[in-house]
Amino acid sequence: MNYLIVISFALLLMTGVESGRDAYIAKKENCTYFCALNPYCNDLCTKNGAKSGYCQWAGRYGNACWCIDLPDKVPIRIPGPCIGR
């Protein structure tokens, strides 16, 4: 019986958890996607697996796309310089 519990717990740990986060979606160079309209960002975010997205006007990184519930595998803007400029 104890083996069954241990094996079940091990399988639970090995499957991993796919979580989402709200953040600025970023290019490989740590640069945000410039935007002017919400539909552009919503399309970009949903194509990358987010629930939705919108254009954050005059935000921390200027006019940039903000995604809601973005998967962990998609790069987000982190503190530091944008290397591609």
From Swiss-Prot:
Superkingdom as given in the UniProt entry: Eukaryota
Signal sequence, renumbered to the chain: 1-19
GO cellular component: extracellular region
GO molecular function: sodium channel inhibitor activity; toxin activity
Predominant localisation class: secreted
Keywords: Disulfide bond, Neurotoxin, Secreted, Signal, Toxin
Limits of the LCN-type CS-alpha/beta domain: 21-83
Keyword Disulfide bond: yes
Keyword Secreted applies: yes
Compartment(s) where it occurs, according to its Swiss-Prot or TrEMBL record: Secreted
Tissue localization of expression: Expressed by the venom gland.
Biological process terms in GO annotation: defense response
Reported function: This protein markedly relaxes the rat carbachol-precontracted anococcygeus muscle. This relaxation is inhibited by the inhibitor of nitric oxide (NO) synthase, N-nitro-L-arginine methyl ester (L-NAME), suggesting that the response induced by this protein is NO-mediated.
Domain notes: Has the structural arrangement of an alpha-helix connected to antiparallel beta-sheets by disulfide bonds (CS-alpha/beta).
Family in the record: Belongs to the long (4 C-C) scorpion toxin superfamily. Sodium channel inhibitor family. Alpha subfamily.
Name of this protein: Makatoxin-3
